[in-house]
């Protein structure tokens, strides 16, 4: 669930983006969706006249609905920013992503998916425990990094209880975090790397 501060930050980002586009002379319409209102909300917008800056991460009250929004935009032939629904769905399936990376020969930290909190075959510490089927860092806090088997079992139980899904356990790699964004369909333009600054985070 989003905290009020997160919602305010999101609104501030939307206002900054909107004012920047309006300053360049582009018409801007800010749309909020609730429940099944997206079809109705988009009905007044001609796909050939608008680009959707898709910042929707979830339909309120509908878990794992980010891909649903992208699918609806595609079904209406809207041009939109962000990943297609198939990619969004894959990104929420961390186990699938790990299997894919391994199959392509790309290095990835040691990992395992556990429905049993005892995780008898895990022996690599420190480790990080996260929900296996959630977006980005949902379910991750300072408690997610575990140093021994007792902490591991506690955190796996936390994932099971609070998210009702298996836990993904990985070898914890300490260090800096970078994001690399790409633009394009087919031929991709890679943007400069951006480092995440966590200095203001309490956990």
Regions found by a protein language model. Name each.
Residues 102-135:
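Rossmann-like NAD(P)H-binding beta-loop-alpha module
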């Amino acid at each position: 669930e989003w905290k009020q501060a997160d919602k305010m930050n999101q609104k501030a980002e939307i206002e900054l983006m909107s004012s920047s586009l309006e300053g360049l002379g582009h018409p801007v319409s800010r749309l909020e969706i609730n429940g099944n209102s997206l079809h109705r909300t988009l009905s007044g917008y001609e796909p050939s006249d608008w680009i959707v800056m898709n910042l929707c991460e979830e339909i309120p009250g509908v878990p794992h609905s980010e891909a649903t929004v992208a699918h609806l935009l595609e079904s209406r032939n809207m041009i939109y920013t962000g990943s297609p629904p198939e990619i969004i769905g894959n990104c929420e399936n961390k186990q699938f992503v790990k299997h894919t990376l391994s199959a392509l020969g790309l290095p990835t930290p040691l990992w395992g998916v556990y429905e049993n909190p005892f995780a008898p075959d895990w022996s690599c510490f420190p480790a990080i425990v996260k929900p296996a089927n959630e977006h980005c860092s949902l379910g991750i806090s300072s408690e997610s990094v575990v140093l021994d088997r007792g902490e591991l079992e506690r955190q796996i139980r936390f994932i099971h209880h609070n998210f009702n899904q298996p836990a993904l356990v990985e070898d914890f790699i300490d260090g800096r975090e970078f994001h690399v964004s790409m633009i394009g369909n087919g031929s991709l333009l890679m943007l400069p790397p951006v480092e995440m600054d966590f200095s203001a985070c309490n956990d």
